[in-house]
């Protein structure tokens, strides 16, 4: 109820409800007092009564109506995690986030904002990740790109900055051409220095991705990346904890965007040194190579435009034979 491993909830009404239901299970079992298994049974029964919408979301994914991959790798595509509030309860499901890039003047387009589906906090998160990109690479070369970010198959409002880490990784993937593992999902916000910040609904998010992976079959490669600052909030279901202990599922706590990049791609982040040097083959090196390619394209487009203008002016200045 408190969604915190170090705190207890002071909301007495839901606690009373669980205790009464646990007492019912204890009485039915002929127990003299309420034991842990009776409390677990009460919590499980409560979840079953409130999971119709959650199961509907899961069914849409399994039937291929809602496109979510849990295997393979794709460029510019990341599994984010979205929370759906349902009164006093909530659940989470994976949400595909994609990024595309082309030559431009350094603009990062938030499609959710453009169509008025994105809230101010989400828009702030996109601006912050854009600032991180400019701060890390903009002093070495011009950001001659135009990028687009979107929550795919999102037909309602998008608010909050908890997907900004996923959006940043999708953008870096699109720029570098490095594919992102679809067996992993990620949540967390980032600041302008790439530090990963805590977010809400952390347990629901992990359990939401776990449920999908469990139905499709756990193979030890699936998992969720969370902010390190959220570790104190972990209160996961027993089946999730058991899967992690058995090595069939994983939860990684990351402190910065570079850690997340390395886990999600398997490629070293390659943080630039004071001279701007980066390890060959690293993500940062490949991003710079992608930016240089876009800059060359931009210059070529501009040169062709000037030549076309000159040709047009020359044609206009020639006398016509009568």
Per-range role (PLM):
Residues 2-70, 271-276, 298-305:
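C-terminal helical "lid" subdomain and adjoining coupling/linker elements of P-loop NTPases
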Residues 5-9, 29-30, 88, 116-120, ...:
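Generic amphipathic alpha-helical segments used as scaffolds and interaction surfaces in large
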Residues 11, 15-18, 32, 90, ...:
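Active-site-proximal structural scaffolding
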Residues 32, 66, 78, 82, ...:
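Compositionally biased, intrinsically disordered low-complexity regions
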Residues 41-42, 48-119, 130:
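Core mixed alpha/beta domains of very large multi-subunit molecular machines
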Residues 95, 101-117, 121-322:
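Peripheral, non-AAA+ core regions of ATP-driven protein-machinery
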């Amino acid at each position: 109820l408190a969604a915190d491993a170090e705190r207890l909830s002071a909301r007495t009404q839901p606690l009373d409800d669980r205790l009464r239901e646990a007492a019912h299970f204890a009485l039915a079992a002929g127990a003299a007092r309420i034991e842990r298994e009776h409390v677990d049974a009460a919590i499980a029964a409560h979840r079953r009564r409130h999971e119709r919408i959650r199961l509907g979301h899961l069914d849409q994914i399994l039937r291929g109506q809602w496109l979510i991959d849990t295997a393979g790798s794709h460029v510019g595509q990341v599994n984010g995690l979205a929370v759906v509030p349902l009164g006093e309860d909530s659940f989470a499901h994976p949400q595909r986030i994609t990024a595309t890039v082309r030559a431009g003047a350094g603009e990062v387009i938030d499609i959710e904002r453009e169509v008025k589906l994105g809230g101010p906090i989400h828009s702030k998160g996109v601006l912050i990740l854009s600032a991180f990109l400019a701060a890390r690479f903009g002093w070495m070369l011009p950001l001659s790109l135009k990028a687009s970010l979107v929550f795919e198959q999102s037909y309602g409002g998008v608010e909050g900055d908890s997907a900004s880490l996923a959006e940043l990784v999708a953008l870096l993937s699109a720029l570098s051409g490095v594919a992102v593992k679809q067996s992993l999902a990620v949540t967390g916000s980032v600041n302008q220095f790439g530090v990963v910040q805590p977010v809400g609904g952390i347990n629901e998010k992990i359990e939401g991705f776990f449920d999908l992976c469990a139905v499709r079959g756990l193979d030890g490669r699936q998992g969720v990346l969370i902010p390190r600052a959220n570790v104190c909030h972990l209160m996961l279901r027993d089946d999730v904890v058991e899967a992690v202990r058995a090595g069939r599922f994983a939860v990684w706590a990351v402190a910065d965007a570079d850690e997340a990049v390395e886990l999600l791609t398997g490629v070293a982040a390659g943080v630039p040194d004071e001279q701007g040097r980066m390890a060959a083959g690293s993500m940062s090196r490949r991003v710079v190579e992608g930016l240089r390619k876009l800059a060359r394209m931009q210059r070529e487009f501009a040169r062709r435009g000037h030549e076309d203008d000159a040709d047009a002016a020359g044609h206009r200045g020639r006398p016509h034979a009568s």
